[in-house]
């Protein structure tokens, strides 16, 4: 599963997930993409589950790019522990998703296969998504 090799600090503030994605909002590596329409957090496990579903459907035909990385640690206190005594330990990693962010890209397959594969992958994700393709001018 994806997670940073090392970070400057072990824990992060919760923060707020506002605005829309301006960077990473266009299909830039592949031919087709899966773009987030809603906002939320995608865990490293969900990202991997969706990747497996997509790659299982395209088999050896296409190439897949993951355009997001879970770089935010989410901490959690153990079960049945009283409040206080500091912040809990990092439990898992998430990527914050804003509307417009391209999550996955694919090339080397037909549009029909790409749509089916991304539909299978999107079912594993907690955000609403849309299928997009690269617009070629001319």
Swiss-Prot record:
Q: Which Cys pairs are S-S linked?
A: none
Query: Which terms under GO biological process does the entry name?
Result: translation
Keyword RNA-binding annotated: yes
**Gene Ontology MF annotations:** rRNA binding; structural constituent of ribosome; tRNA binding
Respond yes or no to whether keyword RNA-binding is given for this record.
yes
- Specify residue ranges for compositional bias: Basic residues: 1-17
Family annotation (PROSITE patterns):
RIBOSOMAL_L16_1, RIBOSOMAL_L16_2
Q: Which SUPFAM superfamilies match?
A: Ribosomal protein L16p/L10e (SSF54686)
Indicate the transmembrane segments per the record.
none
The alphabetized UniProt keywords are:
Ribonucleoprotein, Ribosomal protein, RNA-binding, rRNA-binding, tRNA-binding
Spell out the InterPro entries in the cross-references.
Answer: Ribosomal_uL16, Ribosomal_uL16_bact-type, Ribosomal_uL16_CS, Ribosomal_uL16_dom, Ribosomal_uL16_sf
Query: Which GO cellular component terms are attached?
Result: cytosolic large ribosomal subunit
Where do the record's region annotations for Disordered lie?
A: 1-22
Query: What family name appears in the similarity comment?
Result: Belongs to the universal ribosomal protein uL16 family.
What is said about its interaction partners and assembly?
Answer: Part of the 50S ribosomal subunit.
Q: What does this protein do?
A: Binds 23S rRNA and is also seen to make contacts with the A and possibly P site tRNAs.
What is the designated name of this protein?
Answer: Large ribosomal subunit protein uL16
Record the organism: Acidithiobacillus ferrooxidans (strain ATCC 23270 / DSM 14882 / CIP 104768 / NCIMB 8455)
Q: Which gene encodes it?
A: rplP
């Amino acid at each position: 599963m994806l997670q940073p090799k090392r970070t400057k600090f072990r824990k992060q503030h919760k923060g707020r997930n506002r605005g829309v994605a301006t960077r990473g909002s266009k299909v830039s590596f592949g031919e087709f993409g899966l773009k987030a329409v809603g906002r939320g957090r995608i865990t490293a496990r969900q990202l991997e589950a969706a990747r497996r579903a997509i790659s299982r459907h395209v088999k050896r035909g296409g190439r897949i790019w993951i355009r997001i990385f879970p770089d935010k640690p989410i901490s959690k206190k153990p079960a049945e522990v009283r409040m206080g005594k500091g912040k809990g330990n990092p439990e898992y990693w998430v990527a914050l998703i804003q509307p417009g962010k391209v999550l996955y890209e694919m090339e080397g397959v037909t549009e029909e296969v790409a749509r089916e594969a991304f539909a299978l992958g999107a079912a594993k994700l907690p955000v609403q998504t849309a299928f997009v393709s690269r617009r070629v001018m001319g």
